[in-house]
Amino acid sequence: ALQTDYIDLYWLHRDDLRFSPGEIVERMNQWIRQGYIRYFGVSNWTAKRIMEANEYAASHGLSGAVASQIQYGLGICTPSDWGDSTIVCMDNSEYMAYEKLQIPVYGYSAQAEGYFPLYIRGGSGALGSDTRKKYDTPVNRIRADRLKQLMKKKQYSLSWIMAEYVLRSSFPAMFIMGGSNESRMKEIMGQYNCGKKQLTDEEWEIILKTTP
């Protein structure tokens, strides 16, 4: 179906806690030796499990996980907010672990399902029920209010701000984003290609302060 002899990067989409990290590493390396895949990454694994897997791989002369995919963006949320205990969301402990791991992190839901532009325009009442459940928290409201204040002083792309938040990480990181129309996608990719920062470090400090 894929019309290819091998997969460059094979993603394990969910962790399976019935198996030890070492068992999973062994199976992935079997596929690498057989030529089915070149590398493997993990999606919705905790950093702790990734560390265990990669430590096992290193001690046995095997290939470990080369990339991770978790929920990561300016919009803070939790698995409980999503109603799904099998996903992993970026938090302080995960962030510090990735600073040690230094493997690429692909952040999904980096746009927080449009939470910030919707909230800035119309408050909580402008949000759909699913977005409200996942993202309408005190921390995210504070961040939205600060973005709104900055918008009064300078013009910038909210879509690109969402991407810039992930790209400014202290480890390799990439955003996974979508757009409702072609112009939005061109806007995001245009900003990415020019590589220009919209916010200063001082402005980011204002947005990310944990107190009102």
Model-derived segments and spans:
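Active-site groove signature of glycoside hydrolases
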Residues: 1-20
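Beta/alpha (TIM)-barrel catalytic core signal, keyed to glycine-rich beta->alpha loops juxtaposed to Asp/Glu
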Residues: 15-212
